[in-house]
Amino acid sequence: MSLTIPANLVLNPRSNKSLTQSVPKSSARFVCSDDKSSSSTPQSMKAFSAAVALSSILLSAPMPAVADISGLTPCKDSKQFAKREKQQIKKLESSLKLYAPESAPALALNAQIEKTKRRFDNYGKYGLLCGSDGLPHLIVNGDQRHWGEFITPGILFLYIAGWIGWVGRSYLIAISGEKKPAMKEIIIDVPLASRIIFRGFIWPVAAYREFLNGDLIAKDV
C-alpha cells in the first residue's frame, strides 16, 4: 500500500521565507502602535489639567459691568448720571450758603453732601446700569452679576418682614392666657415684648421646629 501526496500540498520554500519575514514586521507594527497609545495618555492628562486651570481662572475673575441689556449703560459711563450728581450737589451747596459755617443746619447739609457723593460713587463702583434718564435700574432677570441689586435685598426684606410677623405672633400667643389680653394689645407689655423681640431673630429655626411639632398652624380656629 502506497501513499501519494498531491503536489499542491507541498509547501513552497519561497512562501515559507516570506511567511517568516512577515511575522516580525507585523509584530514590530504592533509594538509601535502600543508605544503610541501609551505616550498619548500623558498628553491627554496635560490637556485636561490645562483646561481645568483655565476654567478656574475664568470663573474666579471678576465680571466687569457691561451694557448687557438694551437701552442701559453702566452708570459710571452715563452722562445723565453724572449730570444728576452735579445737580443734587449744587442744590445742597446753594442751601449751605444760607447758614453759618458751624451751625447745626450747615453741619447737617455737609453730611448730606458727603452722603450724596458716596451714594453716587457706589452706584458706579458696583456696576449698576442706568437708563437714558440717568437713574439706576434694578435687573431682576437672575443674572449673577446683578444679584446684589435685587436678590440680596429681597432676601433681607423677607427676613425682616418674617421677624416682625413672628414677634407679633409670639406676643399674641404669650398674652392669650392673661385675664385681659385685649388690654395688653392696647398697652404693650414692654418687658415681655423686649424678650420676645430678641428671641425673634432666630425665627426661621423656631418656625421650622414648630412645623415639625405641628404647632405652627392652629388646628381649631
Curated annotation (Swiss-Prot):
GO terms of biological process kind: photosynthesis
Signal peptide (UniProt feature, chain positions): none
Keyword Transit peptide: yes
Principal location class: plastid
Function as written in the Swiss-Prot or TrEMBL entry: Participates in efficiency of electron transfer from plastocyanin to P700 (or cytochrome c553 in algae and cyanobacteria). This plastocyanin-docking protein contributes to the specific association of plastocyanin to PSI.
Additional record remark: Plants lacking PSAF have altered thylakoid structure and are not viable.
SUPFAM superfamilies documented for this protein: Subunit III of photosystem I reaction centre, PsaF (SSF81536)
Organism, as annotated: Arabidopsis thaliana
Record-linked Pfam families: PSI_PsaF
Gene that this polypeptide is encoded by: PSAF
Name of this protein: Photosystem I reaction center subunit III, chloroplastic
The organelle targeting sequence, given as a residue range: 1-32, 33-67
Membrane topology according to the record: Single-pass membrane protein
GO cellular component: chloroplast; chloroplast envelope; chloroplast thylakoid; chloroplast thylakoid membrane; nucleus; photosystem I reaction center; plastoglobule; thylakoid
Gene Ontology molecular function: mRNA binding; protein domain specific binding
Keyword presence, Thylakoid: yes
Keywords for the protein's UniProt record, in alphabetical order: Chloroplast, Membrane, Photosynthesis, Photosystem I, Plastid, Thylakoid, Transit peptide, Transmembrane, Transmembrane helix
Entry similarity comment: Belongs to the PsaF family.
